[in-house]
Amino acid sequence: MFKKILLNLLFPKKCYGCSASDTWLCSKCLESLQEYQGEIPRAMNNRCDLIIAGQYQDPVLNKLIIDFKFGGNQELSKPLSKVIIKELDKKITINSLTGNNWGELIIIPVPLHIKRKKWRGFNQSELLAKELSNYYNWPISLK
């Protein structure tokens, strides 16, 4: 608790896009992130849609990802999960309107090599998966 308070005093939370205080990514900057413009591939012989949540070249998103993966800031899983949720919500709406449903869904984070996890201190895809699981109330498999 004390460590968190001290870190907030030394490194206050501010939006990566506009520097607004008390947030890593404000709603205005979340909405202004560049959307992916390329063709979205399909996986598993067209049985599985892929979702690309943003343009990696977007400077705000790029900085968030780099600081999350290599800067050790685990709190960035929250704004990054919002980026994913924004795209997933579109897909869920389209699928429900067309009669497609998600069926039985389980979230499986991408495994991270043990050396990389030890170096980083956490598996970033696991943190994102937990955020999505909490938001959608979908089961998660961490095995």
Regions found by a protein language model. Name each.
Residues 1-143:
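Glycine-rich phosphate/pyrophosphate-handling loop used in enzymes and phosphotransfer proteins
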